From Swiss-Prot:
Keywords: Ligase, Phosphoprotein, Pyridine nucleotide biosynthesis. It comes from Salmonella choleraesuis (strain SC-B67). Pfam families: NAPRTase, NAPRTase_N. The modification Phosphohistidine is found at residue 220. This is Nicotinate phosphoribosyltransferase. Transiently phosphorylated on a His residue during the reaction cycle. Phosphorylation strongly increases the affinity for substrates and increases the rate of nicotinate D-ribonucleotide production. Dephosphorylation regenerates the low-affinity form of the enzyme, leading to product release. One of its GO terms (biological process) is NAD biosynthetic process via the salvage pathway. The keyword Membrane does not apply. Pathway: Cofactor biosynthesis; NAD(+) biosynthesis; nicotinate D-ribonucleotide from nicotinate: step 1/1.
Length: 400
């Protein structure tokens, strides 16, 4: 296989905003914590043939650094502190932290090192894998086909919402990690900027260059790591929620609910957390059932749901977002994050269903037990059983 002609990535900021948000919190609170993360392809795609090309891109990433104009732009945002930004200015990717192998056609990737550094690999590495694979599989597809597909979807969207008050509909681009390419994501986002309901992107590089609002708070790994950082497994989720508020007391306050199922989350999400966090993010399970649970929980606590925001981001497309908007718009604030269905929605192109997830913290196992059984990730079945027991969950799902 011929190697990719040039580096896929051109900016340290070509990543999701929540990576920097979490990295700052790790820098301040968990500087010496060590982690391991692993790549997983949820489909049967045999991606091992791309291992050499991926390794070449990983090696090229060590040359990325925060540029002066990027540093100044980040300095103007309200939640970054000077000590972290000065450290980030010196940050370089360390390719020695990444082991990429072809295991009889299966792509294996394992990341190890300090959490403050390893945290940066996931999103750009997934974007690299996605772009490389699509480059070889669909060499004739690109920006034109992506924009044509988007225009068709926008025509349908306009018809679907013709009789709706769309003043409270807010859409965000969450498409970095599984995009067809960097150029396609930029073209899609620039087109969506023309729509009044488009409010921002999770990609810090695009947000800076296109003068958009960067979107994102924290990911599953924040909660997973606390399973070993916290001295008590049963209180680890509350410890994660409290530590986030310690770093960001009055901003970036959307909490992810499905690291250990929504029901377990709500048991930990008492009046103080519910009051201080601005809202919740859905990332697995039935979105309507989840939203109803969230609203009922706020009401039970005496909190007006209209003062809170629900963010939906699980496998969304525009019609699904409209359906959820119809259902919830009069009862709660809403935002919708769409990823693959925007940035890799091209006829005859199959998006990759790929993730990189934390599997260890300080040498011990961590797990994600989401509201979708197929998304459960952990090597250690004994730890999964312990986690389920600690959070009073039935012992029914197997770790994948």
């Amino acid at each position: 296989m011929t190697q990719f002609a040039s580096p896929v990535l051109h900016s340290l900021l070509d990543t999701d905003a929540y990576k920097l948000h979490m990295q700052q919190a790790v820098f301040h609170h968990y500087y010496d914590v060590q982690v391991a993360a692993e790549f997983r392809c949820r489909d049967d795609d045999l991606l091992g043939i791309y291992a050499d090309a991926i390794r070449e891109q990983v090696d090229a990433m060590q040359h990325l650094r925060l540029q002066e104009d990027e540093f100044q732009w980040l300095s103007g945002l309200p939640f970054f502190k000077p000590d972290y930004l000065n450290w980030l200015r010196e940050f370089r990717y360390n390719p020695a932290q990444v082991c990429v192998t072809n295991d009889n056609g299966k792509l294996n990737i394992r990341l190890t090192g300090p959490w403050r550094e390893v945290i940066m690999w996931e999103v750009p590495l997934l974007a690299v894998i996605s772009e490389l694979v699509h480059h070889y599989r669909s060499p004739n597809a690109g920006v034109d086909q992506a924009l044509d597909a988007l225009e068709s979807k926008l025509v349908d969207f306009t018809a679907l919402t013709a009789n709706l008050d769309m003043s409270r509909f807010h859409l965000m681009d969450f498409g970095t990690r599984r995009r067809f390419s960097r150029e396609v994501q930029q073209a899609i986002v620039k087109r969506l900027q023309q729509e009044s309901w488009f409010v921002g992107t999770s990609n810090y590089d695009l947000a800076r260059r296109l003068a958009l609002t960067p979107m994102g708070t924290q990911a599953h790994e924040w909660f997973q790591a606390h399973q070993q950082i916290s001295p008590d497994l049963a209180t680890s989720q509350r410890a994660a929620l409290a530590a986030w508020l310690n770093e960001y007391p009055d901003q970036l306050g959307i909490a992810l609910t499905d690291c250990i199922t929504m029901d377990a989350f709500l048991r930990d999400f008492g009046i103080e957390f519910a009051s201080r966090y601005q809202g919740l993010r859905h990332d697995s399970g039935d979105p309507v059932a989840w939203g109803e649970k969230a609203i009922a929980h706020y009401e039970k606590l005496g909190i007006d749901p209209l003062t809170k925001t629900l963010v939906f981001s699980d496998n969304l497309d525009l019609p699904k977002a409209v359906e959820l908007y119809r259902h919830f718009a009069s009862r709660v604030q809403l935002s919708f994050g769409i990823g693959t269905r925007l940035t890799c929605d091209i006829p005859q192109v199959k998006p990759l269903n790929i993730v990189i997830k934390l599997v260890e913290c300080n040498g011990k196992p961590v797990a994600k037990l989401s509201d979708s059984p197929g998304k459960t990730i952990c090597h250690d079945k004994a730890f999964v059983r312990a986690l389920r027991k600690a959070f009073d969950l039935p012992q029914v799902r197997k770790a994948s």
